């Protein structure tokens, strides 16, 4: 992967499996857009108790030249109650990929105008 990838984890065990999943998903983003300047993935399990939805917070911040900042996230309380962390990560990366493809499409249209 050529994109500078930063992974921060809080109150969740940082396993090789977790890191590999994030790296694989980030590489997929790079295939959607080959000029990502930065990718920061934050994964945490806040201490507050959630009555519904996932207990995890996952956020992806992407920097795309010339000056675009894309954010895809899922907050505690969103999604399914017993959703596993890997499912939440996949879901948020899917959101990021949709945003990225939309941006790339707009950039292509603008360059052909």
PLM features: residue spans?
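N-terminal, polar/charged subdomain of small-to-medium soluble alpha/beta proteins
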Residues: 1-113
